[in-house]
Amino acid sequence: VPDGKVNVAFLKQLKTFITRRAAKGDRFVIICGGGGTCRIYNEGLRRVIKPTKSELDWLGIYTTHLNAQFVRLVFGKLAHPTIVGDHAAFEVKRWKTSVVVGGGHKPGGSTDTNTILFAKKLGAKDVVNISNVDFLYTKDPRKFKDAKKITHISWKEYRGMMGDTWTPGMHVPFDPVASRLAQAAKMRVALLGSDVKNLSNFFAGKVYKGSMIE
């Protein structure tokens, strides 16, 4: 939901892409973040009271559930009828649909962390992170004109840039807790933008625009 507006064009293209891949037998777990909605609520709460980190995290988790319900409805019958949150309670053998949509589960990290936990349970080694930023940069490109794209980086280097401390609502390409788990599990995370054609290229093993962390 960039700038408070639903990206309808992106959702239509994503649904078409996943529907086509599903027809070939591919299956998807989509974990939704809280995005700008989460940050708006967190900031609003901070201006009224002094919330604990746990309270801010729970508020963020519920915004991810709203986003997940929305995405689940977008995919209709392709999607599992309920959203998921707890990776430990997710029964892989009972997963019959092409798509499962989920959100956050518990405080202490973003949905990036939950994504890695689901990937570990499913035995996946590659995770795709879709956002409104096409690449990882050396600095925030919105603030610094000399920011440079990073197309490939190790987990050690990435964690050195981002640190290891999680703060509720923090805006980073991939959260510190999830990064630590992904590194330990020897996973790769592809940071891609919202260009579905680019996403298709990645899945097809073609040249794509984005950053790979491994």
Predicted segments with their positions:
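C-terminal catalytic "cap/lid" subdomain
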Residues: V1-E214
